[in-house]
UniProtKB/Swiss-Prot annotation:
The gene is pyrR. The keyword Transcription applies. Coiled coil: none annotated. Regulates the transcription of the pyrimidine nucleotide (pyr) operon in response to exogenous pyrimidines. This is Bifunctional protein PyrR. Keywords: Glycosyltransferase, Transcription, Transcription regulation, Transferase. It catalyses: UMP + diphosphate = 5-phospho-alpha-D-ribose 1-diphosphate + uracil. It is an enzyme of class 2 (transferase). One of its GO terms (molecular function) is uracil phosphoribosyltransferase activity. InterPro entries: PRibTrfase_dom, PRTase-like, PyrR, PyrR_bifunctional.
């Protein structure tokens, strides 16, 4: 069973609200780097970056971060017969002494964010990392919390939250899937 909990209009308003919150918190946008966790987190990061640039006229740098080899559940994520291929990030941008705005689609156990923080070290030592999450569904296994949340959606562990983006799904929406 599927229920749409965020439609396209709400999706874009959420992107706009998160972007405004980032602008309000950071008077100097020159020290920001936006890092999107591949796959859907990277597309959301791009939308946030575009909105911030549109509102402020800035040119905030960004990268897409592949965390495949930093995950602690790799044996479950890939079929045994297939080895993952490391693609790294879209470009190399130093985050040394910068504030990183780390973006992902769903916050669940916190393990993806832990892996992203490990991967981020390869790009330098950030002065600060702030977390943007489009949907926080609870059920944390690690002590991780978001600085900017699009929507809190309490779920059962058996439910799934699916953030759909134009690049991968042909639309912008969020669905709650239950058995």
């Amino acid at each position: 069973m599927e229920k749409i909990i965020i439609d396209e209009d709400q999706f874009m308003r959420t992107i706009s609200r998160i972007s405004h919150e980032i602008i309000e918190k950071h008077k100097n946008l020159n020290d920001l780097v936006i890092v999107g966790i591949k796959r859907r987190g990277a597309e959301i990061a791009e939308l946030v970056k575009r909105k911030i640039n549109e509102l402020t006229g800035s040119r905030i740098p960004s990268i897409d971060l592949d965390i495949t080899f930093y995950r602690d559940d790799l044996e479950y994520a890939e079929p045994n017969s297939q080895s993952p291929v490391y693609n790294g990030s879209s470009d190399f941008i130093s985050v040394q002494n910068k504030t990183v705005i780390l973006v992902d689609d769903v916050l669940f156990t916190g393990r993806t964010i832990r892996a992203a923080l490990d991967a981020l070290v390869d790009f330098g030592r950030a002065s600060k990392v702030e977390l943007v999450i489009f949907v926080d569904r609870g059920h944390r296994e690690l002590p991780i919390r978001a600085d900017y949340v699009g929507k809190n959606v309490p779920t059962s562990r058996s439910e799934k939250v699916q953030v759909r983006t134009m690049k991968f799904d042909g639309c912008y929406e969020v669905a709650l899937l239950s058995k």
